[in-house]
Amino acid sequence: MNIEHLSHWSGQLNREMYLNRYGHAGIPVVVFASSGGSHNEYYDFCMIDACAQFIEEGRVQFFTLSSVDSDSWLCNWKNPHDRAEMHRAYERYVIEEAIPFIKHKTGWFDPMMTTGCSMGAYHALNFFLQHPDVFNKVIALSGVYDARFFVGDFGGDEAIYQNSPSDYIWNQNDGWFIDRYRQAEIIVCTGLGAWEQDGLPSFYKLKEAFDHKNIPAWFAEWGHDVAHDWEWWRKQMPYFLGQMYL
């Protein structure tokens, strides 16, 4: 398997940003880390091994990104608005710097896939919903999609609202976005077992919104034995990759 350890300077974040590439061909899959995770996390927890068949066949290539969650949503000493603004800087990094970097490395100029587990699932779905021209496939595993989970009640703060998918999706009526959502492959999965309860309200709220707007998506509920843990994500990710058009 081709493995590359990469980095590039981010003017948006004013720091060196690290990312890894796993694979040599196929659609790029942009991976967001879980809470406090690094660009090495996906490999360290054997997610790359779990998806090795798809990688070695040249159907997908994974790009695992660095996170700034400790400076944004998880930075409890900052006020909620400043945490959202730091996330916005990260969004600009991903869209304006990381994605062009990946395009240059791969020669892939079509829309990409995005994925993540836990907090990475929040990022994956949020980035897809905000940028359906950049991403047209998403696999979100065990996420919480309500920004209140990170910052509490945010009132009318627009910067936070625009990054709370289970809220803003209800008011997304722009045909440009809706058309792209309807053409995409969307998988949102949760277990019903240990440590999954925090994500269930926003999971069901999202499902209701997608149904209301006639956006085709697979909201998959796995069993009461399925916990919020890597053991299950290693099973879910290759299963769902196998259901996608690659």
Language-model segments: residues:
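Non-catalytic cap/lid and distal C-terminal segments of serine-dependent acyl enzymes
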Residues: M1-L246
